[in-house]
């Protein structure tokens, strides 16, 4: 679906180390290739144990996993909103993404200098927040100038509503808060859709900790959790140092042994990719046949015809019905369609069916 998460963070917080770990195919549980579109963009396999299980049952000729694009966004300094440093490029890159992964330094290490001289993840967060908020204020001011006259003098109800919504966002941003927490009804957000507010994008915070804090967190992490409570954002604890060590290991077995020794069940990279998928409000359905078992990415809430359209637009246009098997039932009956039917577990769904995460689907269509 071409959806992107952008990784942001100040210099020396571990952002590039994490991106490099993500961009290393060896660091992923399944050996699907990582490819680079350009130096700072990676297409990364989404780990999914269900796909592995379906592959074991069906034994297909080909397996196609879900992927997600991760963008390493460089160039943030104080003043980026005014174009300082690589500010203009930074802001253009972040505007193109669908969600933000914000990496914060939550470890002490005298050998790794901090751009501001001391470790303070809340200050670091606020530096980036402020630059994005300033850029959003600039975008809002420009739009207000366009609609203000019509809103105040004419009888243009649309302009009046747009002006009112923009004013709510403006006051919220002026109070030092991000657009995503503004008290605006979901249906009113369409009034700002054309100005692509940076701080309206969903965000996740990654606390980069030392090796000893990866299981439990530390005082820095607790401060971050308290600071982002209002945003209802996910906070992940990852050690970029550990992830870099994992990336050096050759085999999946070696990586699992290494994680077990640390008391971890999966790598931080895997956790991060899965969390990014959730952040983008995505879901997965599967098609399963001897030629191919494949994971398909959809937005949560897609109807059956919309989901069919992800495979090919003809599937959506000529949609007749969808045959649906729940993942749990497919596994329980070892993929036998005959037994699944006998047990009444093969659903036949029409155009209004909302596809559920994990559904195994077969579409009937006529073009």
What are these regions (language model features)?
Residues 30-31, 112-116, 217-219, 249:
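Short amphipathic alpha-helical segments
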């Amino acid at each position: 679906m071409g959806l992107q998460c952008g990784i942001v963070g100040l210099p020396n917080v571990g952002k590039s180390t994490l991106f490099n770990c993500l961009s290393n195919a060896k660091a992923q549980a399944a050996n699907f290739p990582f490819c680079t579109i350009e130096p700072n963009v990676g297409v990364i396999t989404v780990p999914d144990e269900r796909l592995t299980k379906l592959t074991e049952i069906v034994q297909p000729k080909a397996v196609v996993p879900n992927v997600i694009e991760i963008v390493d966004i460089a160039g943030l300094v104080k003043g980026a909103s005014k174009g300082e440093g690589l500010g203009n490029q930074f802001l253009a890159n972040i505007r193109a993404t669908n969600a933000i992964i914000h990496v914060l330094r939550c470890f002490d290490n005298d050998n790794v200098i901090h751009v501001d001289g001391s470790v303070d993840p809340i200050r670091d967060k606020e530096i980036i927040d402020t630059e994005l908020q300033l850029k959003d204020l600039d975008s809002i001011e420009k739009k207000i100038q366009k609609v203000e006259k019509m809103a105040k003098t004419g009888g243009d109800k649309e302009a009046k509503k747009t002006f009112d919504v923009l004013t709510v966002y403006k006051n919220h941003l002026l109070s030092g808060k991000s657009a995503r927490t503004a008290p605006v009804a979901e249906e009113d957000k369409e009034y700002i859709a054309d100005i692509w507010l940076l701080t309206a994008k969903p965000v996740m915070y990654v606390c980069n900790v030392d090796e000893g804090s990866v299981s439990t967190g530390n005082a820095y992490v607790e401060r971050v959790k308290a600071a982002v409570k209002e945003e209802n954002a996910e906070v992940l604890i990852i050690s970029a140092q550990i992830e870099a060590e994992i990336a050096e290991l050759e085999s999946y077995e070696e990586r699992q042994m290494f994680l077990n020794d640390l008391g971890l069940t999966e790598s931080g990279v895997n956790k991060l990719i899965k969390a990014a998928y959730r952040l983008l409000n995505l879901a997965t359905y599967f098609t399963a046949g001897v030629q191919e078992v494949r994971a398909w990415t959809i937005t949560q809430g897609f109807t059956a015809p919309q989901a069919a359209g992800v495979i090919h637009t003809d599937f959506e246009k000529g949609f007749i019905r969808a045959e649906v098997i729940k993942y749990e039932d497919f596994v329980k009956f070892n993929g036998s369609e005959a037994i699944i039917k006998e047990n009444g577990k093969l659903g036949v769904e029409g155009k209004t069916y909302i596809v559920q995460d994990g559904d195994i689907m077969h579409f009937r269509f006529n073009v």
